[in-house]
Amino acid sequence: MKLSVVILNYNVRYFLELCLKSVEAAFKNIEAEIIVVDNYSTDESCSMVKTLFPKVKLIQKKENWGFSKGNNIGVVEAKGEYICILNPDTVIAEDTFENILAFADLQDNLGIIGCRLIDGKGRFLPESKRNVPTPMVSIKKIFGNSTDYYATQLNQHETGKVDILVGAFMLIKRELYNTVKGFDEDYFMYGEDVDLSYRVIKMGLDNIYFGNTTVIHYKGESTLKDIKYAKRFYQAMKIFYKKHFRNYGLFDLLVWIGSKVMPFFMSGNLEKTQKAKAYVLISERAIQTLRGFTKPLSVIQKIETYEKGTEYIFDNNSLSFKQIMRQIDGFPENSESTFKILPKNSNFILGSNSSKTRGEVVFLKDN
């Protein structure tokens, strides 16, 4: 088997459904499997997987083990040559795995491969490629200076070596994952991807950012970035520095102080979301509306012009995931547009209008 996709889920039933549909669509020419580890969700995630995706291997836990342990549990069951660690609030294109695996097979000193992530509004997520967060770099980031935190030396569309990749999408050989013993389970949430990336480059292997493939990451859906995030960030960095840096005490104190200040910076920088002025469905089907959608809706087959303040709904019943992502990615950043996807054979649309807030699910009648 070539690939095992491991998805750790916690209470994101509808985002998980969309994610799984996109992953299955990307398996056309690949011998692959999907493993979903559920961290004791209280929604209908598990029943949905059993009903709609019977081929998916579902591992149901009786408590929330956190990101590291949950993913490690999934990898134990994996059979693929490669492992893809994938967040449940992501959407991939039909050729994502085909392209990235072809590239991976050509590398002779491969560590981990990451790819270009965009949020629900089509904006590039800079954490897709990062530098090692040394104590000083982290302190600068906490106080608003991210220049050295992100790997800006590499353009978002380029491919090249970087230090740190993001846990929302990581491709790694299963043999290497097992050699480094996977994610460090001392981390509950945040920091585990930094730690894994750092351990791999310390082995002399190359972590590579693959800018030719784009994945939507509805960042903020699983956890809100607030005071809890600040505390977890501090705890994660404390573990990382204690493990990898000597004489970290002073930096530990500074990071702790910064983590107390961070929520005030974040609360002042929260993105303002505006209500859409118009709603447009892009579909090649012969339909006039979406049953159960309560707002005025126009239907078009193709976007000819970008209308500011419009919410565009993409119909996955007639458009491929790659087509949808290309159109979202093609919007200018100042378009003030928002986007949602109607998954194939589903009665809901979903999306996220901000990378700092929870995603939104809108329920429909059967269409």
Q: Where are the language model's segments positioned?
A:
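A short, conserved alpha-helix in the catalytic core of glycosyltransferases
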Residues: H157, D163-T214
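Short, well-formed alpha-helical segments that are part of the catalytic scaffolds
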Residues: I7, N11-F27, R291-F293
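Short, flexible, basic/aromatic active-site loop/helix in glycosyltransferases
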Residues: V132-V162
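Conserved donor NDP-sugar-binding/catalytic core segment of glycosyltransferases
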Residues: V91-E127
